[in-house]
């Protein structure tokens, strides 16, 4: 029984799953909106918000933590320079999920995950 077990495995080994998360967060921070399945969006939403919170701290240690997670160094610069200023007065809730309906091929519930303007 899976009582009080959090997180999703997406039927992948740990390395593949973490790589999936890192790629999706990198894409969200780069394009500021992505269309993905609802379970994946729910899983990466908190990770993306943590990256923006690291950007708001602005310390060298937080920059290094962000560089260890996000694949493209230019996106870390975007988080620390642009997004941190945009969300300076906002205490959290940097993302929005909008339901788009089921996917044509397999019926998976799709959402648009975007950064709040």
Swiss-Prot record:
Pfam families the record matches: Ribosomal_L17
An example Gene Ontology CC term for this record: cytosolic large ribosomal subunit
Domain of life (superkingdom): Bacteria
InterPro entries: Ribosomal_bL17, Ribosomal_bL17_sf
Keyword Ribonucleoprotein: yes
Keyword Ribosomal protein: yes
SUPFAM superfamilies the record matches: Prokaryotic ribosomal protein L17
GO molecular function, one term: structural constituent of ribosome
Keyword terms, alphabetized: Ribonucleoprotein, Ribosomal protein
GO biological process, one term: translation
Family in the record: Belongs to the bacterial ribosomal protein bL17 family.
HAMAP family with a match to the protein in the record: Ribosomal_bL17
Subunit structure: Part of the 50S ribosomal subunit. Contacts protein L32.
Protein name (Swiss-Prot/TrEMBL): Large ribosomal subunit protein bL17
Lineage: Bacteria, Bacillati, Chloroflexota, Dehalococcoidia, Dehalococcoidales
Gene that encodes the chain: rplQ
């Amino acid at each position: 029984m899976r009582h009080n077990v959090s997180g999703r495995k997406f039927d992948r080994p740990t390395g593949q799953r973490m790589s999936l998360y890192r790629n999706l967060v990198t894409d969200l921070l780069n394009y500021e909106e992505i269309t993905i399945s609802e379970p994946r969006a729910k899983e990466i939403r908190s990770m993306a918000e943590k990256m923006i919170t690291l950007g708001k701290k602005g310390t060298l240690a937080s920059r290094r933590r962000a560089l260890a997670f996000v694949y493209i160094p230019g996106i870390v610069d975007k988080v620390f320079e642009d997004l941190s200023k945009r969300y300076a007065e906002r205490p959290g809730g940097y993302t929005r999920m909008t339901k788009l309906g089921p996917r044509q091929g397999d019926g998976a519930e799709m959402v648009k995950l975007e950064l709040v303007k």
